[in-house]
Amino acid sequence: MAGQPEDPSLERHFKGHRDTVTTVDFNPNTKQLASGSMDSCLMIWNMKPQMRAYRFVGHKDAILSVDFSPSGHLIASASRDKTVRLWVPSVKGESTVFKAHTGTVRSVSFSGDGQSLVTASDDKTIKVWTVHRQKFLFSLNQHINWVRCAKFSPDGRLIVSASDDKTIKLWDKTSRECIHSFCEHGGFVNFVDFHPSGTCIAAAATDNTVKVWDIRMNKLIQHYQVHSGVVNSLSFHPSGNYLITASNDSTLKVLDLLEGRLLYTLHGHQGPVTSVKFSREGEFFASGGSDEQVMVWKTNFDSASYADLLKYRQHDQFLNGGDYTSGVPAADRHRPERNAQTDQADDLEPRHIQMSAKDRSSPLSYTSRSIDQHHPQAEDGNLRTVASTLEHIVGQLDILTRTVGILEQRLSLTEDKLKECIDNQQATVSLSHSATKTPSF
């Protein structure tokens, strides 16, 4: 059982926003979670069950991006009101504000050393600032449409940006030059980020795809077509071996990057999932959606071999366009397929949550080469038949899971109505007793 991963499970379920949740991020100490919303509010959720959440008000329009500093002492938020705010994540909610752009600020991100900020805007520019006193340093200006996202590389030497001009640009922070443009997306790119090793980038796009490039060779090495809707956000597991994606199709997808396949499909949000983020240690991930909810999930699937996986997080050997399983311990490479079990946490109204994890045999679109090209045609046909059968079974299981979720919701509504009737009856009895009492002199 040592190499057998467990299924992700729902841990917490937060309600408090009054409109679509657009962005989420964990405090590096994993004790707090920040979320921004179209309701213009920043919420700080405390992971301890009994601690109250903080609502920070200051932005005049929707918050589109939040990011904790590496120290956890500050939170940066970017807004449609064209400003960036730096908040202290305490009960006082103190903040400083600066006008960052002449258009909507869609993205804000700290550098790895916590000394710099990078912002991206509808004014078609990317700007870099000092955190101390929010001093403007320089601007990157080659995009010809809105810039939706910008991130520092882990070592802080590079910046990656994604724009509605359908390009992803890689910038050298020192020379301030664009060193490469990736133009292989059929749609707009909503989100882009660096792999923890700094050797690759992944992008989420409106053409329902997720693509991974090796930035040393400027080569597309993985191409996933697993969503049926626009992909809004993604997050790398800190080990670098997993990628989680959030989509308008109401699902989260967990991808195994080493084996190039889909691991899990998670159902929980009612409507588009707009944001997803792993915690700094990878133990949890959070998601936000148009249903105004924030969900925290326990990763689980990395627990059995996390220590081993970290050993293989080498800057020069991962995702080199060759053998995707080169960094996986031999015991884990050919583990048998299994059906993942549905798991729910009984915390903060979990009856609204429905989570299923699909079988891992779901086909992926490869760009580098087909992993089955060496098999005879007959065997290949058999494999396709088996895969088709498994997909059908998984589809039926998914329908059953959804049905159970609906039944649970109906049962919960019945329980709530019954409790309300009992409360009303008790109140009526109490009033009746008080009315029959005669005053004593």
Curated annotation (Swiss-Prot):
Pfam families: WD40 (PF00400)
Presence of the UniProt keyword Cytoplasm in the record: yes
Keywords assigned by UniProt, alphabetized: Coiled coil, Cytoplasm, Cytoskeleton, Repeat, WD repeat
SUPFAM superfamilies named in the record: WD40 repeat-like
Subcellular location: Cytoplasm, Cytoskeleton
Keyword Lipoprotein tagged: no
GO cellular component term, pick one: cytoskeleton
WD repeats: 16-55, 58-97, 100-139, 142-181, 184-223, 226-265, 268-307
PANTHER family xref list: POC1 CENTRIOLAR PROTEIN HOMOLOG A, WD REPEAT-CONTAINING PROTEIN 55
Annotated function: May play an important role in centriole assembly and/or stability and ciliogenesis.
Recorded family membership: Belongs to the WD repeat POC1 family.
Subunit text: Interacts with pat.
Protein name: POC1 centriolar protein homolog A
